[in-house]
A protein has these predicted regions:
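Conserved MFS/SLC helix-loop-helix module at the cytosolic interface between two early adjacent transmembrane helices
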Residues: 63-102
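Cytoplasmic helix-loop-helix junction between adjacent transmembrane helices
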Residues: 107-144
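Juxtamembrane helix-start elements in MFS-like secondary transporters
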Residues: 44-52, 77
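Small-residue-rich segments within alpha-helical transmembrane domains of MFS-like 12-TM solute carriers
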Residues: 24, 28, 112-120, 150
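Residue-level signature of mid-helix packing/kink "hotspots" within the transmembrane helices
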Residues: 28, 55-64, 149-150
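Small-residue-rich transmembrane alpha-helices and their cytosolic helix-loop interfaces
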Residues: 20, 52, 56, 85, ...
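Extracytoplasmic
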Residues: 11-45, 62-66
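Helical-face signature of the major facilitator-like transporter fold
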Residues: 16-24, 92, 100-112
Length: 153
C-alpha cells in the first residue's frame, strides 16, 4: 500500500516535470521559427544567431544572479518556481510584439534568465521530496528538460 506521503511526492514530481517540459520548450522556440522571424524583422543569419545565443547568455546571467542572492533559499520554492515560469511565458511573448532586433534580443535574454530560475529551483524542490528514489526523480527531471528543450523541433 502506498502511503499518502509517497503519493504526494510522485504527484509533486509529475507536476514539476510537466512544468519543466512546458517552460523549457521556450528554450529553442526562436530557432524553430527563425525563418519567420527573419522575414518579419528583416534579420540576417548573424542576427538570428544572436537571438538563439541570447537565451544561453540570459541563462548564465540568471543563474549567477539567482545563486549570488540565494533566491531558492530566501523565497518559498513553490513561489519561486511559479514566478520563474510566469516570467518565462511573459518574456517569450515579448517577441510577438517586437518591432526591432534589440527588443527581440532583450526578450530572449529575459527568457534565458527566467529559465535559470525554473530549472535549478525545480531540481532543488524535487530533491527535498525524495530520499530513497532521488536518483530516479532527478533523472525524470533531466528527461523533462530534454523533452522540453526539444519540443519546438
Amino acid at each position: 500500500m502506498i502511503m499518502k506521503n509517497q503519493k504526494s511526492q510522485w504527484l509533486a514530481l509529475s507536476m514539476t516535470a510537466l512544468g519543466i517540459v512546458l517552460t523549457l520548450s521556450t528554450w529553442f522556440s526562436t530557432t524553430s521559427v527563425a525563418g519567420e522571424i527573419s522575414v518579419a524583422l528583416t534579420l540576417n543569419n548573424s542576427q538570428i544567431a544572436w537571438l538563439t545565443n541570447a537565451v544561453q547568455g540570459g541563462f548564465v546571467i540568471g543563474a549567477m544572479i539567482s545563486s549570488l542572492f540565494a533566491l531558492a533559499d530566501i523565497w518559498p520554492i513553490k513561489w519561486l518556481l511559479s514566478f520563474g515560469a510566469i516570467c518565462v511565458g511573459l518574456a517569450n511573448l515579448l517577441i510577438l510584439f517586437d518591432t526591432n532586433f534589440a527588443i527581440a534580443v532583450a526578450s530572449r535574454l529575459a527568457t534565458g534568465a527566467s529559465l535559470a530560475i525554473v530549472y535549478p529551483t525545480a531540481m532543488k524542490y524535487i530533491s527535498t521530496w525524495f530520499i530513497k528514489s532521488r536518483g530516479l526523480a532527478m533523472g525524470i527531471l533531466v528527461g523533462a528538460l530534454t523533452i522540453g528543450s526539444a519540443f519546438p523541433h
